[in-house]
């Protein structure tokens, strides 16, 4: 029930955001009519949509299909709102912080930032906030967005999502699982494994892999499968789940594989039974609502979320509901 309530709240916020977009556009358009008279002490009229640029800066690695969906959501929001959206990414926190600083120097109107390594981005994000630039964090960073001065965070509670995965593994009847972390130092991924360990009734060991080298990661996973007691794998990303499935096939083992995050291949693998489940945080929602929330703050002073995060997940994808998800995944929106 807790997960359903969180998802219902997230959908409710999303509906309010989209409804507010229409109101915000009307307010922006009407601002020109109220500029005269004796109200010289009022703040300047809000910017018109066509004059707004929002920069999305993520920690995505090159070729990561998950972030292609986030980018698509952000760009669709830009199209729907009639604003410019710039997208840049770098998995190195030092370089990501430079991208944030560069956006500020180039007079961005707002920022949407993922925080896989909050400590590495703290200075840049706080500097943006101090300079009056509205910031919303997405995906990673749910424990730090308030301290950094962001409006809200759009994503899932990673520990809660991990707990959900642990329960799914219990339902699958496995006893000895490896949790594959594909990005070193990513606090969200560490939280997923920690959450899964909390609810999983068996034993679980973390395994470090590399999402930028899936072939090597497959070999790393396959080597762990030489231990005959390992009967489950929890992948933390869609691309890594593919490497896990291939490792199981190559090892000739009967091993249950579950994953976080959804793409077209993941949806198909759930349908054909190669994956037992997928935990979906809906990355398209993160990109779309991140941009929309910043836009609303710029044109109408709205603070989306009311001081709380906006939950985009977790949702559980199984064979029972994967067919519908697969249709959207083929479009690059799930």
Q: How does the language model describe each region?
A:
Residues 21-42:
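Bacterial lipoprotein signal-peptidase II cleavage site
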Residues 41-81, 86-102, 115-118, 181-191, ...:
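Extracytoplasmic "Venus flytrap"
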Residues 12, 43-46, 50, 199-202, ...:
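Hinge/cleft segment of the Venus flytrap/periplasmic-binding protein
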Residues 96, 152-177, 215-218, 263-266, ...:
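Hydrophobic alpha-helical segments within soluble ligand-binding/sensing domains
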Residues 1-25:
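Secretory targeting and sorting signals
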Residues 97, 113-130, 196, 211-268:
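Hydrophobic alpha-helical
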Residues 119, 123-160, 263-271, 275-276, ...:
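Flexible loop/hinge segments that line or gate small-molecule binding clefts
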Residues 65-80, 161-165, 187-204, 243, ...:
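Short, solvent-exposed amphipathic alpha-helices that sit
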